[in-house]
From Swiss-Prot:
Cellular component, GO, one term: plasma membrane
Source species: Haemophilus influenzae (strain PittGG)
Transmembrane segments: 26-46, 71-91, 107-127, 137-157, 166-186, 189-209, 212-232, 233-253, 273-293, 299-319, 340-360, 373-393
Sequence similarity: Belongs to the NhaA Na(+)/H(+) (TC 2.A.33) antiporter family.
Localization per record: Cell inner membrane
Function: Na(+)/H(+) antiporter that extrudes sodium in exchange for external protons.
Molecular function (Gene Ontology), one example: sodium:proton antiporter activity
Predominant localisation class: membrane
UniProt keyword annotations, A-Z: Antiport, Cell inner membrane, Cell membrane, Ion transport, Membrane, Sodium, Sodium transport, Transmembrane, Transmembrane helix, Transport
Taxon lineage: Bacteria, Pseudomonadati, Pseudomonadota, Gammaproteobacteria, Pasteurellales
Full protein name: Na(+)/H(+) antiporter NhaA
C-alpha cells in the first residue's frame, strides 16, 4: 500500500512539474527563484562555499590551444553566448518575417527603444558624473530583461491585448540590438589580429553554410564553436559570436524545412530554464555584510536604480508619445498610451541583462564595493519596476 502511495505521489509531482514548465511565466519564476537562492547563499554560513564554487578554475585544452577561466566566467562568456545565439535568431526572424519586417511595424517600437536606451544612460550620467571611476556604467540601465518582463506580463495574459505583447517583444528585440552594438563598440579591448583572422574565416564559413541553405544544425554548431573560441581570444566580447551564429542560420532550407525555427525551439527551453537561471544564480549573489543605510545614497546605486525606474519609462513613453504627435509613427491598433506607459515601466526590469552589462563595465579590478553597489542598484531598480509595471499593466488592461 505504501509502495502504491509513493508511486501515486511521484506521478502527481511529475504532473505538477510538467504543468509548471508549460506556464508562460515559468521562465521568469525560475529566474527569480535562482536569484533569491543566490542571495540567500551569499548571506548564509555557506557564502564561502558559494564563492569558491563560482571561482572554481575550469580549463579546456585542445593541443596547444587552451582556455582557462573560472566557472563564473564560463557562465558569463560561454553560456551567455548561447543565449545570444537565440537573440540573433529572434532578431533575424522578426526583421524578415515578423513584427519588424515592414517600416510601419518597426518604426514605433524602434523609436520607443531608442528612448529607452538614451534616457536611462543620460539619467545615469547625470547622477554619477561627479565620480570618473563610475563613467563606464552608463550602459547598465539601458538593458531590459525580456524573460522577466514577459513573465510579469504572462501573469495577466488573459487581459493583455495581443498588440501590446507584440509591442513589448519588438521593443525588447531592438533593445537587444542596442545592447549588442554597445558591447561591440565599448566593451571590446586588447584586440588580437591573429584571433580576428580566425574569426573572419569562421564567419565566412557560416555565410557559405547559409548561402547554400545547409540545414544540418551540427555544421553551425561546429563552426560556431570555432568562432566563439576565436572571438573570445580576439578581445571582442564572445557573446557577439552568438549573435553572428544566430543570424547565419537560414530561415528556410533547400527542401522547405525551417532550420531557424527548429534550432530556436531547442534553444528557447535551454535559455529559459537553464542558461538564464544559471546566470542569475552566478551573478545575483549580493552579500549584505557591511552594507548600511548610507550606501543607499551612493551615486552608483542611485544612478542605476534611477536609470531603470525613471529613465526607462520616461524614455520609452516620451519618445513614443512625441513620435506619434509629430506624425513619425502610428500608435498600433488595439492599445492606448496608458498601456504603453505600463509597458515602459515594466521595461525597467534590467535584472540579468543589466547584471551582464555591469560585469563588462566593472571588472574585478573595480573593487568589491563597486560590484556590490551596482548589483544592489540593479536589484532595487528591477524590483520596483516589476511591482509598479505589474500594477499599472493590471489597471490599464482591466479598463480596456
Amino acid at each position: 500500500m505504501n509502495f502504491l502511495l509513493c508511486i501515486f505521489k511521484g506521478v502527481y509531482v511529475i504532473k505538477l512539474i510538467q504543468r509548471f514548465f508549460k506556464l508562460e511565466s515559468a521562465g521568469g519564476i525560475l529566474l527569480l527563484f535562482s536569484a533569491v537562492v543566490a542571495m540567500l547563499l551569499a548571506n548564509s554560513p555557506l557564502s564561502n562555499q558559494y564563492n569558491d564554487f563560482l571561482n572554481l578554475p575550469v580549463s579546456l585544452q585542445i593541443g596547444s590551444f587552451s582556455i582557462n577561466k573560472t566557472l563564473i566566467h564560463w557562465i558569463n562568456d560561454g553560456f551567455m553566448a548561447v543565449f545570444f545565439v537565440l537573440v540573433g535568431m529572434e532578431v533575424k526572424k522578426e526583421l524578415f518575417e515578423g513584427a519588424l519586417s515592414t517600416y510601419q511595424q518597426a518604426i514605433f517600437p524602434a523609436i520607443a527603444a531608442i528612448g529607452g536606451m538614451v534616457i536611462p544612460a543620460v539619467v545615469y550620467w547625470f547622477i554619477a558624473k561627479q565620480d570618473p571611476s563610475l563613467a563606464n556604467g552608463w550602459a547598465i540601465p539601458m538593458a531590459t530583461d525580456i524573460a522577466f518582463a514577459l513573465g510579469i506580463m504572462a501573469l495577466l495574459s488573459k487581459q493583455v491585448p495581443l498588440p501590446l505583447k507584440i509591442f513589448l517583444l519588438a521593443l525588447a528585440i531592438i533593445d537587444d540590438l542596442g545592447a549588442i552594438v554597445v558591447i561591440a563598440l565599448f566593451f571590446s579591448h586588447g584586440l588580437s589580429v591573429q584571433a580576428l583572422i580566425f574569426s573572419a574565416v569562421a564567419i565566412i564559413a557560416l555565410i557559405l553554410l547559409n548561402r547554400f541553405k545547409v540545414s544540418a544544425l551540427c555544421a553551425y554548431m561546429v563552426v560556431g564553436a570555432i568562432l566563439w573560441a576565436s572571438v573570445l581570444k580576439s578581445g571582442v566580447h564572445a557573446t557577439l559570436a552568438g549573435v553572428i551564429i544566430g543570424f547565419s542560420i537560414p530561415l528556410k532550407g533547400k527542401k522547405g524545412e525551417r532550420p531557424l525555427d527548429d534550432f530556436e525551439h531547442i534553444l528557447s527551453s535551454w535559455s529559459s530554464f537553464v542558461i538564464l537561471p544559471l546566470f542569475a544564480f552566478a551573478n545575483a549573489g549580493v552579500s549584505f555584510a557591511g552594507i548600511d543605510v548610507n550606501m543607499i545614497s551612493s551615486p552608483l546605486l542611485l544612478a542605476i536604480a534611477s536609470g531603470l525606474i525613471i529613465g526607462k519609462p520616461v524614455g520609452i513613453f516620451g519618445f513614443s508619445y512625441i513620435s506619434v504627435k509629430l506624425g513619425l509613427a502610428k500608435l498600433p491598433d488595439g492599445i492606448n498610451f496608458k498601456q504603453i506607459f505600463a509597458v515602459a515601466v515594466l521595461c525597467g526590469i534590467g535584472f540579468t541583462m543589466s547584471m551582464f552589462l555591469a560585469s563588462l563595465a566593472f571588472d574585478a579590478n573595480a573593487g568589491e564595493s563597486v560590484n556590490t553597489l551596482s548589483r544592489l542598484g540593479i536589484l532595487l531598480g528591477s524590483t520596483v519596476s516589476a511591482i509598479l509595471g505589474y500594477l499599472f499593466l493590471k489597471q490599464t488592461t482591466k479598463l480596456s
